[in-house]
C-alpha cells in the first residue's frame, strides 16, 4: 500500500532506542507494533478487563523478562492502551529468581495446577515471534490464513528468515 520499506521490527526496546538515537532517518521504517510484552499488557487491560468486568485501574500487570531494557519500555510514550500503563512493573528473570530464593519457594513441593490461559487458545505465531524473521513469517502466515480461510499445515517461508538474499548498496 505504499508503506515505507524495508520494514524493520524488533522486540528489543534497547535496539529500538539505539535506532532512534543513531539512525533517526530510519525511524519511519520501524514497525508501529508494540513488543509482545506491551501487546499482552494492552490486551489484559482492554480485552481481558472488559470480558471480566474489571476496571483496568484495578489490574497490576507484571512482566518477567530477561532484559533490563524492558523496564525502560514500560515508561515510553504510547504504552497505555486503556489510559493506564499497559505494563505496570517489569522485573528481570534474575530478579524473579532472587525473589523465589528469598521467599524460600520450593517448586517441587508445590501442588500441580492447570495452565492459566486468560486469553484462550494461542497460535503458532507466538512461538516464532522472537526468532530472526519470525515477526514477518507470523504476519505472512496470518495473512494467508485470513485471506484463504484455511489453516496452514507445514508451510515454510524460508526467504523471510535470516540475511540471505539481502543486498547492500
Regions found by a protein language model. Name each.
Residues 1-169:
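Iron-sulfur-associated redox domains of electron-transfer enzymes in respiratory
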